[in-house]
């Protein structure tokens, strides 16, 4: 019986380690998301949904389509935020410490091992920053289906952001997919 349990454990190890590898091995991701921001007590503070695009090394597109219409586009070291309801556009430079969690999730494995401790369990991997002053204290990545990922982030205040990412398979992204749309305000 022990031998069977050990064999099952050893067979499960590569699958567990592969969860993060499958995520970081991609050059990019695109699809739909749902996002919930939760208080430390678990109360839902905000919910939104929309579409996203991620492309290595520094391209990020996060378009909230419900309940509002907002867009965040990061290209290299620049971040542009557009809020159509408020008719506001904000552009600013990003430092390396301000990069989104997706920057880390698309980083090479060696970079992750330098910046985080990794704990793989089942179909999930928890990344804990080695730097105790990091804004996000924990990132959990779980594969819930072939094209369904859950990413949960815990910040310094104890709030968590729970993201469900439904990815489109076999979509090739290029930097031109991350152009900021022109607005008339």
Language model: regions and residue ranges:
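N-terminal signal peptide c-region/cleavage motif recognized by signal peptidases
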Residues: 7-14
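Short, well-ordered turn and helix-capping elements at secondary-structure junctions
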Residues: 35-39, 56-58, 66-68, 129-131, ...
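An acidic-aromatic
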Residues: 51-99, 161
């Amino acid at each position: 019986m022990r031998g069977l349990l050990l064999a099952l454990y050893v067979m499960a190890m590569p699958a567990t380690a592969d969860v993060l590898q499958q995520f970081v091995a991609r050059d990019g991701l695109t699809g739909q998301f749902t996002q919930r921001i939760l208080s430390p007590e678990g109360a839902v503070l905000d919910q939104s949904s929309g579409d996203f695009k991620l492309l290595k090394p520094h391209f990020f597109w996060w378009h909230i389509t419900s309940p509002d219409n907002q867009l965040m586009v990061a290209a290299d070291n620049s971040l542009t935020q557009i809020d159509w309801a408020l008719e506001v556009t904000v552009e600013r430079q990003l430092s390396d410490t301000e990069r989104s969690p997706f920057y880390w999730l698309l980083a090479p494995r060696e970079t992750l091992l330098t910046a985080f401790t990794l704990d793989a369990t089942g179909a999930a991997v928890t990344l804990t920053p080695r730097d105790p002053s990091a804004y996000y204290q924990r990132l959990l990545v779980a594969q819930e289906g072939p094209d369904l990922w859950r990413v949960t982030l815990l910040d310094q205040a104890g709030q968590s952001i729970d993201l469900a990412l439904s990815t489109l398979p076999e979509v090739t992204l290029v930097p031109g997919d991350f152009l900021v749309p022109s607005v008339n305000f």
